[in-house]
Amino acid sequence: MEKSEIKGFIAKRCAKELKDGDVVNLGIGLPTLIPHYLPEGVEVIIHAELGIVSAGKAPKEGDENYDPYHVVDAGGSPASVAYGGGFIDSASNFGLIRGGHVDACFLGALEVDAEGNLANWIIPGKKMPGMGGAMDLCVGAKHCIVCMEHTAKG
């Protein structure tokens, strides 16, 4: 398999874990590809840490909804809001997570040990220091799935 195909392969496999109607939180990076691979007939509600309930697929440059300056995901990449979606404040947002209302979360990681412990909190000098809502999601979501390449080189 070509390196360029690996992330899509992982996202497609992750999408198979979802059921129609699931409330899903997607971490930054690879997890944002998952909506592009949802099985036919499976519609999910995408919850975003920045307060979007019912986020749309990540738009690409040239798409009608592409606007890199107004709606972004937790990683700062362009995002969209699905028809009927909306925005909530941070307290309500984390109330959804901590209250057990998220069916599944998909997180990226730096590494995972043999017991499944997740390390994703910092790479010195990189853009995204800190774990964001990962702690809350690991505890509050009904299922937590780490999606990442096996090695830094794929």
Indicate where each model-derived feature is located.
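N-terminal active-site beta-alpha-beta segment that forms phosphate/nucleotide-binding
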Residues: 1-82
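Conserved phosphate- and dinucleotide-binding cores of soluble alpha/beta proteins
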Residues: 2-9, 60-154
